[in-house]
Amino acid sequence: MLNSALLWKVWLRIDNSTDEVNQPIAVQFDEIDTVDDLKSRFFQKLSSTRWREINDNASIAIGLYAPKFDNQADNTSSNNTNDNSCRSKSNGAGSGANLSVNSNTKSSVSPTAGSFGLSKDLAKDRNVLQHPKPTQKRGALYDAFAAVPTVAATTNVDFPPNEAPMLSPQRPYSTSPKQFPATTKSPLLRFASVSPYPKFHSDNQIMASAGLTYVSPHNKNKYTRPLIRKGLNFTTESVNDCTYKIIFEPDELAINIYKELFGTMGSQPASQPLLIFSNVNLRQDVPPLDILNVVDYVPTNEEISQQKTQPTDHGAVGVFHLDDHISPGEQGLKQTIGDKADLKGKDGNSSPQEFKLITDEEQLRRASQELKDEEKDAESPWQAILLLPKGYKGGVDFRNKPVAHTDSSFNNEDTITHSELEVNTGSPSQESGSLNEAGIGITQPMSEVQRRKEDVTPASPILTSSQTPHYSNSLYNAPFAVSSPPDPLPNLFTTTSEKVFPKINVLIVEDNVINQAILGSFLRKHKISYKLAKNGQEAVNIWKEGGLHLIFMDLQLPVLSGIEAAKQIRDFEKQNGIGIQKSLNNSHSNLEKGTSKRFSQAPVIIVALTASNSQMDKRKALLSGCNDYLTKPVNLHWLSKKITEWGCMQALIDFDSWKQGESRMTDSVLVKSPQKPIAPSNPHSFKQATSMTPTHSPVRKNSNLSPTQIEL
């Protein structure tokens, strides 16, 4: 029976795992949970592991290993011979099979009925269920777990080892290629439901033949009980001549598996877990060199660890050198042409490509220095280093596009037409570009503005149809620099980030010092002024000082939460009429009160910073008055685009204030510049002149204020 007072949990462990720490994990389940539910909860336990990233619910299965028996052998000598042969095969297999299985026997030679333990003769990582030889033909689960036979011995046929089905690789462990045939069961005492307590039915009769009498290994009493359990749905997969896998179906109830294998709830120890079989193995062999495509090949961590154990010769050619650990999201794939890679000889025949794969920045610098030293030798062929970014797709055909020429026409100049120039400038990398050692190493991804500047540079101006410059084919000459015409647009492509980002004032409300440093460093880099606040109340006080256009508000703040701080700011804006269209008289009165000196006429943009993806948190942030929200960790490249967007929105909403700021700057320059004062003939001429100022200039709205007074 199952103990209802205990938590229902089952121990699971990953089979054939390359991790050094592979401990059993307890997974709780209910009476209606199936094997699929156990898989989902097991994935939740390992949500942050690499094993979880490469596996899914359809690629794993729950089961265990079981031994194969020769049921036709009745004498003891033959049984011992078969056991020894299977034991020797298991030990000889080594890590090829990598059997990491359940252990339910104390001795593999003559275990007693119902005993569980580990076979001493087996390897530490190869534990196979061992049970006594049955005296009659029974089902596979009975042989593996000493379970009760479901049918009579005359109707139950053993599953031949040579006909053990193999699972389909397209749908691994999710379907049943071959199952044991379903048969009718004897009308014996059984469980009518998954309740921990058995129920008797009127149609059940306690009648069992002597051949089917069975003493349960989980029953501590000594009397015989003809108790039969519900048959389990499972498939088998042959591992070797002595062992096969038992894989439970996804729709099988977990409670039926537990009481069939372990009996009462809580009787399964952590040393006897069920196994998680996976068809995606973390340990993969390095593919042969002759079938390896360097452009599309990205080494895995296991391949790199295997290469570390082997001696590495940096001077060898045509050998892959995986010298450093490279993880996803780090340095891109770097491919280097070998020391003696002569792509096109003097006779015109192409030689085989020789290359080295480099993933270490220091080794890349050494290779660059070697190429630089070889330049002094005039007879050595020209070398190059090709840097490929992570995720690069496509081939690199060196035969159709030779990098260097060694013939006599090396220094001859050819004419490049305007159409060819467009093709060359549109490509991400120039074939005739010089080697730049300063740019070798880990490079940051370019922003959109930088990428546009790289595509069209001042050295490649816009040409008319009458201008056809001449260029050199030399590898180490500057591209497009020979006899080029004067640049018709000298300052067209000298844009910087200072002109891209709007002039806004930002308030960072964050209690985390690390997040403050990251955002502050980003804003300082782009010349954006900002202030810091550690809690919501401090943010409200700083906002009341005025001059802010954008607020990054963290929702989880001490003293006053981000949501409450946003509500107070919006309420204060309503009380002061910020964001409400007013007439000229009202704006004139506000200017006299001095309110517009501190606050702009546009409401501040509040962006919520949240670490949760919950729609409820985002909804609360928007209802509190936030204009937008960002989920941590914030992508800085994406943040730069959003700052430009929010700054443009603020400029469009409060266009008069932005124009007023530009006019203040202009008036300040005019006041500081030395000019001869002109005395007006009429004392009211200044007022008349100011009244004729166009109405679209907000600086002249108040005719009683001079330009110097407005500046103050």
Curated annotation (Swiss-Prot):
Task: Write down the Gene3D superfamilies for this protein, in alphabetical order.
Answer: 3.40.50.2300
| Sequence positions bearing 4-aspartylphosphate | 554
Low complexity: which segments have biased composition?
A: 74-85
UniProt KW Glycoprotein keyword: no
| Listed name of the protein | Osmolarity two-component system protein SSK1
Query: Which spans does this entry mark as compositional bias, Polar residues?
Result: 87-113, 682-712
Q: Which organism is it from?
A: Saccharomyces cerevisiae (strain ATCC 204508 / S288c)
* PTM remark: The phosphorelay mechanism involves the sequential transfer of a phosphate group from 'His-576' (H1) to 'Asp-1144' (D1) of SLN1, then to 'His-64' (H2) of YPD1 and finally to Asp-554 (D2) of SSK1.
**Keywords tagged on the record:** Cytoplasm, Phosphoprotein, Two-component regulatory system
The cellular location(s) given in this protein's UniProt record come to: Cytoplasm
